[in-house]
Amino acid sequence: NQKTILGHPSGLYVLFFTEMWERFSYYGMRAILVLFLVSSFTEGGWGWERSEALSLYALYTGLVYVTPIFGGLIADQILGYRNAIIIGALIMTLGHAAMALEVFYDFFLYVGLICLIIGNGLFKPNISSIVGKLYKTEGQDKDAGYTIFYMGINSGAFLGILLCGYIGENEGWHYGFGLAGIFMFLGMLQFYYAQNIFGSIGVFNKNNSKEKVVDESSGKDL
């Protein structure tokens, strides 16, 4: 029963911008991670060999695609979609902040990457799930809604790579990491304060969770 904007539920645009800023932070950080690791000490980097930097990058990227499996289960059984998104966004914000502080202590970079992996696992699968819940039936409207949502992903990725890359290379790598964190924080705040627009969508309900498990195991529509 949400109001519509351009034929779509108004909540879609909250998700659009939340996802856009999260993708800004994700791709912005990824764009400069390897460059930072291979840069010399005089340039503010760690002076790693290219193979070492790519190994860490590959490990991080691989784990980012694994943790959403667990994040989806946790949201279904314990947190609910909305709480999972907020907690995940907060953990990712702290992760970016930790990476920005690597200039003081090297281990902050690793702490930051771990936070990003965990936070992404909670955030990514559940924000996409809410998009689907906005529409009562399958059809062109739902397909178009996902298209709009993915436009936010692409826009955030483009802006993140552009701005974090520029700031990181020209002003300092930690500033690039910090900029990614700022926009992740903005995305989290936006979702947190606008979440009531979704009504009961994404709120954890123990009874509904049990029904969902029974439904999926039996193959019947409850």
Model-predicted regions and their roles:
Residues 31-54:
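Short amphipathic helix-loop junctions that connect adjacent transmembrane helices
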Residues 54-76, 124, 158:
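Central cavity-lining transmembrane alpha-helices of secondary-active solute carriers
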Residues 88-107:
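C-terminal ends and interior cores of transmembrane alpha-helices
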Residues 95, 106-123:
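Hydrophobic core of transmembrane alpha-helices in multi-pass small-molecule transporters
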Residues 64, 140-169, 176-187:
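Glycine-rich segments within core transmembrane alpha-helices of 12-TM secondary carriers
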Residues 1-14, 137, 165-222:
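Intracellular loop-helix junctions on the cytosolic face of multi-pass helical membrane proteins
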Residues 122-136:
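Intracellular juxtamembrane helix-capping segments at the cytosolic ends
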Residues 84-85:
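Primarily marks hydrophobic transmembrane alpha-helices of the MFS/SLC 12-helix fold
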